[in-house]
């Protein structure tokens, strides 16, 4: 079985898109996925399944009524290798990854915080669900531990 992460778009952002993580876990289990767990309240679900990512994306979006990016452990590992080791998300720098929803791939965005205006961030040219680099690295570790 393949280890996947499903990244839901627009979950618990600025008080909108509220989703209970326990209910989310139950909904993913109801689709037949195994070893399901969630990570933080931003719509990250790790699980095992035999189906293809494209099938899971379609079924999850229908069940959850939200846009979802599904990535395998192999894809997350490859992504993490592309991110420069010194890039982080801390007091000095901001690094976000935009997971494309309608096409394969991810977009990396990095800036020094001193160069940013308040509330400034990436402007993606495709529809994405974004996570900061620390979250992505933690998701990889949790996926590897499954």
Task: Label the model's feature ranges.
Residues 2-42, 46-146:
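Surface-exposed, charge/polar-rich loops and edge strands
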